[in-house]
Design a protein with these regions (language model features):
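Auxiliary, metal-adjacent structural segments of Zn-dependent hydrolase domains
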Residues: 274-334, 346-347
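C-terminal, non-catalytic "cap/extension" segments appended to globular domains
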Residues: 317, 353, 361, 388, ...
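Long, well-ordered alpha-helical segments
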Residues: 195-206, 211-212, 250-251, 358-368, ...
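Inter-helical turn/loop segments and adjacent helix faces that build the functional surface
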Residues: 229-230, 253, 257, 297-300, ...
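Post-HExxH zinc-binding segment in Zn-dependent metallohydrolases
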Residues: 241-242, 366, 377-405, 412-414, ...
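Active-site recognition of the HExxH zinc-binding catalytic motif
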Residues: 341-366, 383-386, 391, 429, ...
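Glycine- and acidic
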Residues: 121-122, 180-187, 227-233, 269-279, ...
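A well-structured
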Residues: 1-276, 289
Length: 559
């Protein structure tokens, strides 16, 4: 079914509450394991329908944040999703406490019960806090989506600025950068206020649910069953020792290549004197060549991308009133992934058509899973599929960039390597924030700047506002997806492993990757790494092992 034809009707919350309540009662009164198994399967179908409805409304508002109808629907879900989650927790508790635990584990797997255990942290006390949190996230999104940045007489949104920041003319770059920074500086009070309120709301929710702070609660809500914040801190140390020095070397090399002695932050997005490699065509050109690429990559990826095109399951081009960024979601009732992005004519468009397609492909391959909980893995594992797809498609980059394909590959690898120290900065900052919920906005910004100079010691913003520690205002995950960001870095280390293996044995690596995609979320992060034949970034020396190999690979790309 095409996305535009998917019907939308606001759920009747009284009926929804009744189904949750009846399911809980049926689980409790079931006399046979087979009876409970059927109830759980029926409940899974109900949830697929319900969450598909929620996602249709979410995507349509993302495409036009001024659409009054879907804005009202979004407000409705901001109020009611916490209620739905709490009702779902009660059903989860009934299943978790089942007298037929052995039979249920045999049918659905032990991991299902680990996920249920994570859900049990919520109860009705969380509802008002989650409602407030949702409203604050929407408020942040609207400010960004409706941004108006005036540069050289033209008006841009935040998501339309990246091409300007990559311009080979340094003065042009600097002016564009200053215009973008001014938008965030003009809204400093709003961003500080929204985030301060978010931190307090989340901390109060954690206390209400019996947690010392929000960190432990959110780790549970992220279904992190294999590791805790202490393990993440050790991993950040690994990054500091391996990739921070390499990133500094890479930027030094970039400065020399550009002929710049006083390298600044606004120079980082420009990789070559004659400009970055941008795709040789518009959105239709990109989609057409992506279809050819995915058909040639494998039968599975070809079928998947044909399905996405046929059912119009992508909204790709940046435009006014559209939410910033890119994401992949799914309408599981229709077994359909969906890709949302903001194409802007840069190499980032190809990053999206591979990254978000990696998410979508995994979702497409795991739609056969019995439970909705198993269609998507936890975020740490989910980002492996997307980041790996960026590398698995390297042999086809000539389709998009022609003779500049190697420049794209260099920029992609350089960007991935230098990204990780930034990613752990964002994570470390959030741990500080929720360990110190009473810190003032000024204290938060000061701490952020300390941390970014620790992980990126050569950073020079050439701007007082950003030097005050305000860069994170533009990182939406800090506002609406706390502690998610470290997952990008963990997955990137896994994607690097697939890249190095792919260059050695394409067929075998692709087979491992597809096997991992099919597994969906049926196992925990650490177990999925085993399924995908990947070494664990947290408890092995893989980062130390691959860093010199990646440096060698980067330097070997002829540009």
């Amino acid at each position: 079914m095409k996305f535009k034809d998917m019907p939308y009707t606001r759920p009747d919350m009284e009926k929804v509450k009744k189904i949750f309540k009846e399911t809980k009662e049926k689980i409790g009164s079931a006399d046979l394991a087979a009876e409970q198994i059927k109830i759980i399967k029926d409940f899974a179908d109900f949830k697929k329908d319900l969450y598909t409805t929620i996602e249709i409304a979410n995507v349509r508002l993302s495409i036009d944040t001024t659409d009054e109808f879907y804005e009202n629907e979004n407000n409705f879900f901001n109020e009611n999703k916490p209620i739905i989650e709490t009702l779902n927790t009660e059903v989860s508790r009934a299943i978790y406490n089942s007298k037929f635990r052995t039979e249920l584990e045999k049918e659905f797997g032990k991991h299902y019960f680990k996920l249920l255990e994570c859900k049990l942290v919520l109860n009705e006390k969380a509802i008002p806090f989650m409602q407030k949190e949702n409203a604050l996230s929407t408020k942040y999104d609207k400010i960004i989506a409706n941004s108006k940045i005036i540069f050289r007489g033209k008006e841009y949104t935040v998501s339309q600025m990246p091409p300007l920041l990559q311009n080979p003319d340094r003065e042009f770059r600097k002016e564009a950068y200053q215009a973008r920074v001014k938008f965030f500086e003009d809204h400093q009070e709003e961003f500080d206020s929204i985030y301060d309120e978010m931190v307090k709301v989340r901390t109060e929710m954690a206390h209400a649910l019996g947690y010392e702070n929000y960190i432990d609660l959110q780790y549970k809500l992220l279904n992190r069953t294999d590791y805790n914040h202490k393990d993440v801190a050790k991993y950040r140390e690994k990054v500091l020792k391996t990739l921070t020095p390499l990133a500094v070397k890479i930027r030094k090399s970039q400065a020399e290549r550009l002929g710049i002695k006083d390298f600044k932050y606004f120079d980082e997005a420009c990789d070559f004197k004659d400009g970055n490699s941008n795709p040789n065509g518009d959105v239709d050109f990109i989609v057409k060549n992506a279809q050819k690429m995915y058909r040639e990559l494998s039968t599975e990826t070809g079928d998947f991308f044909d399905f996405m095109i046929e059912n119009e399951l992508m909204d790709l081009v940046a435009k006014p009133k559209k939410r910033v960024g890119g994401y992949c979601t799914s309408f599981d009732k229709y077994k359909s992934p969906f890709i949302f992005s903001n194409f802007n004519g840069t190499k980032g468009d190809i990053d999206v058509i591979t990254h978000e397609a990696g998410h979508a492909f995994q979702c497409y391959m795991s739609q056969y899973q019995l439970l909705p909980e198993y269609i998507w893995p936890t975020y740490d594992a989910a980002e492996i599929h997307s980041m790996s797809m960026e590398f698995l498609t390297w042999p086809w980059m000539e389709l998009f960039f022609g003779k500049n394909a190697n420049k794209f590959k260099y920029s992609a690898l350089k960007g991935a390597l230098t990204f990780i120290p930034y990613g752990v900065t964002i994570d470390h900052f959030q741990h500080y924030v929720y360990e110190n919920p009473n810190a003032t906005p000024a204290e938060r910004r000061k701490k952020y700047h300390e941390l970014e100079l620790m992980y990126e010691p050569d950073l020079d913003y050439d701007n007082d506002f950003y030097n005050s520690g305000a860069f994170w205002f533009s990182q939406g995950h800090v506002f609406w997806a706390p502690f998610y960001y470290i997952d990008y870095t963990l997955a990137q280390v896994c994607a690097f492993q697939y890249l190095l293996k792919y260059l050695d044995n394409k067929e075998e690596t692709l087979k491992e990757y597809i096997t991992l995609c099919k597994a969906g979320g049926s196992e925990s992060f650490f177990k999925l790494l085993e399924i995908g034949n990947l070494k664990n970034p947290m408890n092995t020396e893989i980062l130390e092992e691959i860093t010199p190999k990646l440096e060698e690979l980067l330097n070997s790309i002829k540009i």
